[in-house]
Amino acid sequence: EENEGGIAHLRQGRRDDGVLTLGEAMAQLDASAGNTLTPPDSEYNEQLEKLRAVLRSYKEHNEDVYGYISIPAVGLEYVVVQGEDNDYYLNHNYKKESLVIGSIFVDYRCDDSIAKNFNTVLYGHNIETNGGAMFNRVTDFLKKDVFDNALICIYTMDGVYIYQAFSVYSTRPDSGY
């Protein structure tokens, strides 16, 4: 049942969508490749290639996979998708399965390359369960210490984009922003 497959597991304080965090997936790649020493100057390129391998595996399940978002300071890590509209992923996971909590997704009007966008807009439900889930954790940016220190990392096939918040605004869904 949809509700039991989504919200019930979130209430138990764990993700049950079968998605490894990016760190877990990269650790699996490390383990399967064995421990090999690489020169320090190649470390960035090696990590980027591991990242791309993980993203390719997500894209094998769904061509709509855009990337991955990580905000370590608030414990947010999710696959990011981009659909043909801004409605589909409101209630579907990255595997295109029906899920009441939906996915974090990029506005359909954005380019598939962050570098080509003037603004890249991400959406996700503000669902609060057992300490927060989905984009509810972004509300922690209202706390000064989080706002001042948290980095927002978005990983795509193009590369790694690291942001620091410069403004936080709380609004209601019907505010007409």
Task: Please report, for each region that a protein language model flagged, where it lies by residue.
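Solvent-exposed, non-transmembrane regions of membrane-associated and secreted proteins
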Residues: 1-177
